[in-house]
């Protein structure tokens, strides 16, 4: 059956979106603010392909079985199996393992990723991640620096957030304390990570499918109690094994470093059930959420990450351990929050990049000369090339949010002037070309 244009569904694939200029400009301004923050902290840009070899994405060192359920796969004409990247961390690991890069290697990447998973407010199947990662630093001071960067980034965006913090070593230590077998810990961790999302009874049901009901109930009770306390002192007093104690020690050092980085008290909150779903995390993990004071209906995390000391080394032939830590900001969900709260960033957003509409009065040569002069001074402008009426041009400028209109006729050319209209005030003036250029630049 031949599909004609008339028969085709013109909407984008489910879970993807088109961004019209007004929204795209908002997103661009948010990206620019994030890039500025990332670079202030010494992170450099890196770009990788949207497509990766399937073996890289499906590697046991990569995201794990949960994420593979959401992987988009395809074959090229050479029958090679490929996949769309589901995050920007695995491509970073591949690049670092295949290149001779000096450490510490601090990079940021801003790009689309794809996951064929469930959708909800602020969550899509194609979405943009804004990642920062530092490779080659084993000290938890690196986590503290990333926390400072996170605080600065959300402050620049005008959002009041807090970050949940935990340590996978402590989490493993708590599961060991409960007597949960090592082989069962990864699926148990995945379910505990859902405590706030599906509630205690939902988690209990899932845990009972993995471990004995008695263990499941005991685990749920312990983590529920610890979540209420949210105190490192409580877990520090428990009879934990070596791994658990190391997790506590790292968290204490992390918190003591935050003050030196200028991170205020209460920004990073200890959350003992926080696990992060991806298997490659090895140490401190974190996840950022809006504070209730924002009054948003969006409950999804805005950023998340952690330490993954084993991932990059296992991609390399030498198989050495290479310390790494990073965080990923969700551009889409942050943009949704900003729109929802009608923040300053949205109020000042514009519909177009155009600053000046140049209108010829049957004098295209002069109008084009003026437009080129404007562009030479860095002013974005567009020219009416269709000979529309004055009223139609003014209506267009008003609808598009173009702040100025310049009229160029034979008389204006003769006097080496232009008629300049301020669309906000409605005032018009006849100005010399040099003075108009200065005013518009």
Regions found by a protein language model. Give the residues of each.
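Positively charged, Gly/Ser-enriched RNA/tRNA-binding surfaces
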Residues: 23-41, 52-53, 69, 87-100, ...
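Short, positively charged and aromatic/hydrophobic N-terminal segments
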Residues: 1-3
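A positional/architectural concept
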Residues: 45, 81-84
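Auxiliary tRNA-acceptor-end handling modules of aminoacyl-tRNA synthetases
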Residues: 5-24
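Short, conserved phosphate-binding/catalytic loop or strand-edge motifs used
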Residues: 124-130, 165-173
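Polyanion/phosphate-binding surface patch
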Residues: 50-82
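A generic structural motif
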Residues: 164-165, 188-192, 381-390
């Amino acid at each position: 059956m031949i599909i004609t244009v008339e028969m085709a569904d013109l909407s984008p694939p489910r879970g993807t979106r088109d961004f019209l200029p007004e929204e795209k400009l908002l997103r661009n301004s948010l990206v620019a603010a994030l890039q500025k923050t990332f670079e202030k902290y010494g992170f450099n840009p890196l770009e990788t392909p949207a497509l990766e070899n399937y073996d890289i994405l499906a590697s046991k060192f990569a995201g794990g079985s949960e994420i593979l359920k959401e992987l988009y796969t395809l074959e090229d004409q050479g029958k090679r199996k490929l996949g769309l990247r589901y995050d920007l961390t695995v491509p970073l690991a591949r690049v670092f393992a295949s290149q001779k890069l000096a450490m510490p290697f601090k990079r940021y990447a801003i790009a689309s990723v794809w996951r064929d998973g469930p959708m909800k407010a602020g969550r899509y199947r194609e979405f943009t991640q804004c990642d920062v990662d530092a490779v080659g630093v084993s000290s938890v001071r690196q986590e503290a620096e990333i926390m400072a960067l996170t605080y600065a980034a959300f402050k620049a965006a005008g959002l009041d957030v807090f970050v949940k913090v935990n340590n996978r070593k402590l989490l493993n230590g708590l599961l060991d304390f409960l007597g949960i077998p090592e082989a069962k810990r990864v699926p148990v961790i995945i379910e505990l990570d859902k405590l706030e999302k599906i509630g205690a009874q939902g988690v209990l049901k899932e845990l009972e499918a993995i471990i004995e009901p008695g263990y499941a109930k005991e685990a749920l009770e312990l983590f529920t109690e610890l979540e209420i306390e949210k105190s490192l002192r409580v877990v520090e007093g428990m009879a934990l094994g070596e791994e658990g104690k190391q997790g506590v020690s790292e968290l204490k050092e992390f918190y003591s470093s935050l003050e030196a980085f200028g991170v205020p008290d209460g920004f990073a909150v200890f959350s003992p059930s926080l696990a992060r779903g991806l298997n490659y995390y090895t140490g401190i993990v974190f996840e950022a959420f809006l504070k209730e004071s924002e009054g948003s209906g969006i409950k999804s995390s805005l950023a998340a990450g952690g330490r993954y000391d084993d991932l990059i080394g296992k991609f390399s032939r030498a198989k050495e351990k290479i310390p790494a830590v990073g965080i990923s900001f969700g551009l889409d969900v942050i943009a949704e929050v900003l729109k929802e709260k009608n923040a300053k960033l949205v109020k000042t957003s514009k519909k177009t990049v155009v600053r000046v509409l140049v209108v010829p009065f049957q004098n295209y040569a002069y109008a084009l000369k003026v437009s080129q002069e404007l562009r030479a001074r860095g002013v974005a402008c567009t020219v009416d090339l269709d000979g529309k009426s004055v009223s139609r041009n003014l209506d267009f400028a008003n609808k598009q949010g173009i702040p100025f209109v310049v009229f160029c006729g034979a008389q204006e050319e003769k006097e080496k002037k232009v008629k300049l209209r301020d669309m906000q005030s409605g005032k018009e003036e006849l100005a010399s070309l040099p003075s108009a250029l200065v005013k518009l630049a």
